[in-house]
Amino acid sequence: MLTMDDIVREGHPALREVATEVTFPLSDEEKKLGHDMLEFLINSQDEELAEKYGLRGGVGIAAPQLAVTKRFLAIHVHDEKDRLYSYVLYNPKIRSHSVQQACLSGGEGCLSVDREVPGYVVRSERVTIDAFDENGTPLKLRFKGYPAIVVQHEIDHLNGVMFYDHINKENPSYLPPDVDVFG
């Protein structure tokens, strides 16, 4: 079972590397890590387990956050209609994105960042993702709103990008016109 001790923090070189694609068939270790990542997210959203094991609540995690510079991630997040998006995605790529932008009202956080970083992180409101499941089956997934923000945050990790790299350095509270704000 993964715990917060397994997650590397900002400053670790794995968080700034561009991760390499996995090849199929996946190794047993890659499959297990994908399962463990999803289990961590589910456990972190369970109040009792989170308290028992000292887990910070998370909705997404990428392999580089575990010092594994390979292109896979897990998300476990509900949208505003309470639809669950629970996936382990291997070699995910953004196929297309909306012109309409969105952000979270309180900014973003990260399991690898132990401090609050104020500022808006503006992202695409909708994305279409091409990825593979653990068996190498191709997936085409559409995300909108909060789940879209989460999956973009995790794909950034695969490219060595941290959420705060997107914040306006001169004016963190600047919000471009016509950005939809969630939360």
From Swiss-Prot:
Gene Ontology MF: a single term: metal ion binding
EC number: 3.5.1.88
Record field: catalytic activity: N-terminal N-formyl-L-methionyl-[peptide] + H2O = N-terminal L-methionyl-[peptide] + formate
Keywords: Hydrolase, Iron, Metal-binding, Protein biosynthesis
Gene Ontology biological process: co-translational protein modification; translation
Residues forming the catalytic site: 154
Binding positions (Fe cation): 110, 153, 157
Pfam families assigned: Pep_deformylase (PF01327)
Coiled coil, from the record: none
Enzyme class: hydrolase
Entry note: cofactor: Binds 1 Fe(2+) ion.
Reported cofactor(s): Fe(2+)
Family the UniProt entry places it in: Belongs to the polypeptide deformylase family.
PANTHER family: PEPTIDE DEFORMYLASE, PEPTIDE DEFORMYLASE 2
Function: Removes the formyl group from the N-terminal Met of newly synthesized proteins. Requires at least a dipeptide for an efficient rate of reaction. N-terminal L-methionine is a prerequisite for activity but the enzyme has broad specificity at other positions.
Protein name: Peptide deformylase
